[in-house]
Amino acid sequence: MGIKNLTQFLKKYKVYETIDVAELKYSKICIDTPMFLYKFVSQYPNSNEWLGCFVTLITWLRKWNIHPTFVFEGKAPPEKNQTQEARKESRQKIVSKTDAIEQDLRTYLKSGTITPLLLDTWQKIRSKSTKSLLVKRPLNLIVKNFINVDEIRLEIDRRRKYEFSITFAHVNLLKELLDLMGVGYIQSKGEAEADCVSLWYNNAVDYIVSEDTDVLAYTFAGGAPGTSTPKKVPNTTDLKVITGFNVGESSATIISKQRVLSTLKMTAESFKDFCIMCGTDYNKNIFRVGVEKAYKYISDYKVIENVPLDTSVLDHHNVRKIFRVKKSIKYADKVQWSKYPSDNFVEVLNTFIWTHAGGTVDSDHVFRVLTDPALDIVFE
């Protein structure tokens, strides 16, 4: 997701910064929800235990007096259709391959026949292992003596974990939990990250939380066209994106857009063109022009129009419009300070988690943190 290979590219320039989470106290953040929803559901694809992950995240944020607003995904623009179809095809190929591995394993258990696919799967499992054989053995001896049925079954289970889709049921359950915990959320009509960026330009939030590098490509387009509403000055502070939290170390990883632009010696508009040349969810990159070449081209020629290549595949005129947000107040009023829990919060939360996830949480602890964030309590 996001700009193709941009994260790895930016890591080389050391533009990511780790800060103490205490620096985020009393701030409002908007969260690109699909990122967390996919990550947490993937841990528990066959149950609703993922709800506990959100309870932990929200409680940890509120412990540090950080006030989140979750932004849910809406309908993607038509330019994203090709990417979505490609992802579906890729997912189906993975499912088909897992089915084949499972079938070959059954064949092996019945007849002892090791197919090339089963052999390849086992060799890849072995190569990932930190333990290596001290003595090199011939390939046929390794297969005969060391094929591990249990390890292959674990690999099949691991692959099956990602055979899920985020459904309306997941989204509705999470919204119900957020209401219960007094945390705001926004149902976007379009891309969640676009509305996150719009909220920041509208001075509604202090930080954006997203692993999606798309958020760095957006620029501000001013007031809504065709209206008499005067254009207000957008947020001119440095856009900072939180790409991850480390609960154990009480830290956050942040990337500053201004630092990126300064380091790469680019303007916001040239950086946008650089991102488009890398390839995005809305366009392909030019054949054999990856992130390094894209950077060189834009550094030399500043804009895509000047690049001496056939750039038609980039569809850059349309994609530039997608990466342009307008000043808007349609969601700003939904960004609020988190609310105190109700008097019967403990009972209601316990009932909710037990009903939907079949487990329990330390509701008393959650209640204490939500009512007094300054309490120095570690959530477990």
Swiss-Prot record:
It is found in: Host nucleus. Its cofactor is Mg(2+). It is an enzyme of class 3 (hydrolase). Residues 156-301 are annotated as: I-domain. Mg(2+) 1 binds at residues 32, 73, 191, 193. One of its GO terms (molecular function) is 5'-flap endonuclease activity. Its main location: host cell. Its EC number is 3.1.-.-. Mg(2+) 2 binds at residues 212, 214, 281. InterPro entries: 5-3_exonuclease_C_sf (IPR036279), PIN-like_dom_sf (IPR029060), XPG-I_dom (IPR006086), XPG/Rad2 (IPR006084), XPG_DNA_repair_N (IPR006085). Pfam families: XPG_I, XPG_N. Gene3D superfamilies: 5' to 3' exonuclease, C-terminal subdomain, 5'-nuclease. Keywords: Endonuclease, Host nucleus, Hydrolase, Magnesium, Metal-binding, Nuclease. Residues 1-101 are annotated as: N-domain. Binds 2 magnesium ions per subunit. One of its GO terms (cellular component) is host cell nucleus. It comes from the Viruses. The keyword Plastid does not apply. Probable endonuclease. Belongs to the XPG/RAD2 endonuclease family. This is Probable RAD2-like endonuclease 076L. It comes from Invertebrate iridescent virus 3 (IIV-3). The lineage of its organism: Viruses, Varidnaviria, Bamfordvirae, Nucleocytoviricota, Megaviricetes.
